[in-house]
C-alpha cells in the first residue's frame, strides 16, 4: 500500500510497478 514501504522492501517491485 505504501509506496515508500514497497520501495524499501522490494526495489524490483518498484521498478516494475512504478518504473523508477
Curated annotation (Swiss-Prot):
Catalytic activity, EC: 3.1.3.1
Transmembrane segments: none
Reaction equations catalysed: a phosphate monoester + H2O = an alcohol + phosphate
Enzyme class: hydrolase
Keywords tagged on the record: Disulfide bond, Hydrolase
GO biological process terms on file: peptidyl-tyrosine dephosphorylation
Statement: the UniProt record of this protein carries the keyword Chloroplast: no
GO molecular function, a single term: alkaline phosphatase activity
Regulation: Completely inhibited by thiol-reducing agents, such as DTT and 2-mercaptoethanol. Activity was also inhibited by sodium orthovanadate, sodium molybdate, N-ethylmaleimide, EDTA and zinc ion, but was not inhibited by okadaic acid.
Residue numbers spanned by region Disordered: 1-20
Maturation and modification: The N-terminus is blocked.
Summary of subunit composition and partner proteins: Homodimer; may be disulfide-linked.
Role of this protein: Acts against tyrosine-phosphatases.
Protein name from the UniProt record: Alkaline phosphatase
